[in-house]
From Swiss-Prot:
Name the UniProt record assigns to this protein: Pre-mRNA-splicing factor CLF1
Cellular compartments per GO CC: chromatin; post-mRNA release spliceosomal complex; Prp19 complex; U2-type catalytic step 1 spliceosome; U2-type catalytic step 2 spliceosome; U2-type post-mRNA release spliceosomal complex; U2-type prespliceosome
Gene Ontology molecular function: chromatin binding; DNA replication origin binding
HAT repeats: 45-77, 79-111, 113-145, 147-178, 180-211, 213-247, 251-283, 300-332, 337-369, 383-416, 451-483, 525-557, 629-661
GO biological process entries: cis assembly of pre-catalytic spliceosome; DNA replication initiation; mRNA splicing, via spliceosome; spliceosomal complex assembly
Amino acid sequence: MDTLEPTAVDTHVSAEQILRDVYKKGQKARGSTNIDILDLEELREYQRRKRTEYEGYLKRNRLDMGQWIRYAQFEIEQHDMRRARSIFERALLVDSSFIPLWIRYIDAELKVKCINHARNLMNRAISTLPRVDKLWYKYLIVEESLNNVEIVRSLYTKWCSLEPGVNAWNSFVDFEIRQKNWNGVREIYSKYVMAHPQMQTWLKWVRFENRHGNTEFTRSVYSLAIDTVANLQNLQIWSDMEVAKLVNSFAHWEAAQQEYERSSALYQIAIEKWPSNQLLKAGLLDFEKQFGDINSIEETISYKRKMEYETILSNNAYDYDTWWLYLDLISESFPKQIMQTFEKAIVDSRPKELSKNVQWKRYIYLWMRYICYVELELENSLLEEELFQRLIDDIIPHKHFTFSKIWLMYAKFLIRHDDVPKARKILGKAIGLCPKAKTFKGYIELEVKLKEFDRVRKIYEKFIEFQPSDLQIWSQYGELEENLGDWDRVRGIYTIALDENSDFLTKEAKIVLLQKYITFETESQEFEKARKLYRRYLELNQYSPQSWIEFAMYQTSTPTEQQLLDLAKLQSENVDEDIEFEITDENKLEARKVFEEAIVFFKEKDDKQGRLSILEALKDYEETYGTELDQETVKKRFPKVIKKVRLQNGVEEEFVDYIFPDDIDDDKPKPSKFLELAKKWKQEQAL
């Protein structure tokens, strides 16, 4: 019988199928070897062999506690509890601190209902490892499940005598609550709060008394807690927040019992005991808001805050945040003291340093608030001007630094009061004493609003003298003249900034400014001037491929001189119609000239990568604007990629080189001029 050969399709197995099969095989659990034991002799032989294996392994690695547990479990399965106990005991001699070993040993005794053995074992466990909570809980659960209440209570008492963590105490409390032994719970809490005197412990006791006790018990617990906190405050066990939490809880509980006088007295005593605790004061205010008179509450709050702020400021006169809050309070609650407070603020908080820092800035903001208050609330212009003069002449050290905001505020104040000449003098003085860019900009903005453009030009000239390296100044000056329609001034500004001999602007800044210049000439329809600027743009960009491409695209999108004349003629003939510029073959030709010029430039520089970039751009250009013949012509000019090897520092390395078809054509010998003339004469004779 002929056998069929499997086809390639039949034998093909994908990697995915292989992985799936392996995964499925891995998922299948390997079954343990089944041993059939037929008689007692075979059982003895099996037990002997397994014991030999366990003993041999434990001789090699006696610290493997898991193996000890498995060995003991094997003996338990063989119903040989005597051997199992022996193994557990041997394991405990190796490592008595291994908790799972104790648990398995105890569970083994419990499973065979050897309660006394288990109890003795648990006694040993908690004696050997008294700080392991798990062993205590195991013992307690067993005894409580057997309903041995007294044993459980004695165990808890013994455990808590070691001052364990809060979980042990909480468990003891929960146990006594389950037994409804309320006095026992109180006795536990009396020891609990000594071992763990945290505020949370006291509050737990209070919650217990609220639920299971009476008013007197609850009040006594609160009182005991307050006394304890007061007597042990030097130990710094409790934070201000915890103290306030306890007092607030006590006071609100008294209020719930309608003992409002007790609550108020409690707050007063607590504040006297902890005068720096702001949370207590806040709690008192909250209490008064609920149970006090409105007017008394507001006055109490205001005076209390005033005293607090004055205390803070007497300790640190440079706390400007507190000065602001203090001024807010005085203006709202004590308006008659506001002027005196302002004077005190600007005198006491004046910085001593002669360097501009955050402290000086915040101090000046106090002055600004004072000045704004005088103008808006008092409407006293004379006093306001005096404050400005005082601030400028006596406060700010202009030889070291100044604040432009103050000069500009003063100038705007004078303009609002129709004193423009003095405002100009003030800003001129600011520029003369300590010139700053912000002062110049503010001065320019004011003069622009006043439409004094000649003055604006003079300020810009001073500004440029002060900071000639700031590109933004040149740009804004040019935009100003452009908006005013003075084209010659715009060109003059750009020309001075872009002068080849000037070094105050970086090359990057000049490139940005030159782009603005090109945009300006383009919008002015001075396309030839823009093209000349593009030549400078190429130079500043070090004739990068991108700059050549931008130049070529500019040639496409802008009309030539002849096209401008034609457009003007058409516009004159069709006055009512808008004539739009359309890209013609002439524009495409100018763009191709730029591309070709770039190719020649990179060819002469032997920059093959740059040359390739230009060809790729030309290819994209022809796909948009060219014919199929143009596109094929460009594709034929693309280089052939060749991998070469060169020796670099004694090591051969592979690099990519480009062979351009144009270079190959240039290397071919050109036909003789005489032969070309002869061929041409022969063609003419044939005609």
